[in-house]
Amino acid sequence: MNDNLDQQTLEQIKKFLDNNIDNFITTTVFQDERNINGLLAKIQQKFDLKNFPYKIICLDISHNSWKNPAWWVSAMLWWILSKKNYRHIKVPEELGWNDYESLKYCLIKYFKNNTADLVILDWWKWQLNIVNDLPNEIVLNTDFISIWKWKARSRKWKISGQTEYFFTFEKQIPVDYNLLEDKLLIKLRDEAHRLANKYRIKSWQNIK
């Protein structure tokens, strides 16, 4: 018997885990509360967070040529996607063309009735400057990081294996897709993308 798995089998396992990551995590990693806290502690240490990140949210905007702008907020609670904590925040149309101002509007509105330990912005480090324009009660009690494809957006860099990056004000950290904590943060980002794209398609259908 060959102990080495062939490439096709490895791909099937990877696909299964990608499609069933929540169940896999729940039934294996999270059987012991210490494992949950261990993952959260890794994130706190990795990004020098002031908060222990029990609740993490990620935001993505959707619009149709700057019409019907809205931000979608995906959420993880104890590392599991928490749909009851998802939010859909409509933005005044006059702000739709300005991602920065509409993000500011969204965050202020979100934190009026919600909390989060860590906010993930799907943008470059530049967007982290939003914290300078937010009320102190939000900034003092919340951590912010961003995820950015950077040069990985182009086909040439995808071929070369260029990765995505996490950004803080002090750090630029390549995403390691072999680390569970990194993979889960990317999953949360992708979930925000999914919500925004679903809304965008629905809006176009309504226009037609």
Regions found by a protein language model. Give the residues of each.
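Acidic, glycine-enriched active-site microenvironments
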Residues: 1-208
